[in-house]
């Protein structure tokens, strides 16, 4: 089985953390590459991961969320301490490159207008009054998701083809 790539990372408050050390804290780790904190779609996903995190823990799984946001940006968010999982700050995009998580070729290529999930998320954004914040990183960055066992085996990977092409919590739970 293919091994997940190990890396050092920083959070809003800590530097020099090791991914392999974090992975050993649970049977399975959901490594999610999102865009940045100012992105409303990413905000919506973050809220869902937080609300449903107990389901991951019931499976002895954890989330490690990678954002292009800086530690300073995360520290400015008053609710950052309430996020129940690790949020990795990668403003230079080094981890995106390490895991070959690419960006869309153009802003239009980021969206699939025929994707029901896109429209469902757009409606949810409006209902929750989520607004676009500061731009950070590569604006055309696409998300990705990897499932990693406690011994660093990479047993599932998903590279998004559009901004809304990321597995739902229900889909992730089934894969665990």
Regions found by a protein language model. Give the residues of each.
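Short beta-strand/turn micro-motifs composed of small residues
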Residues: 34, 67, 149
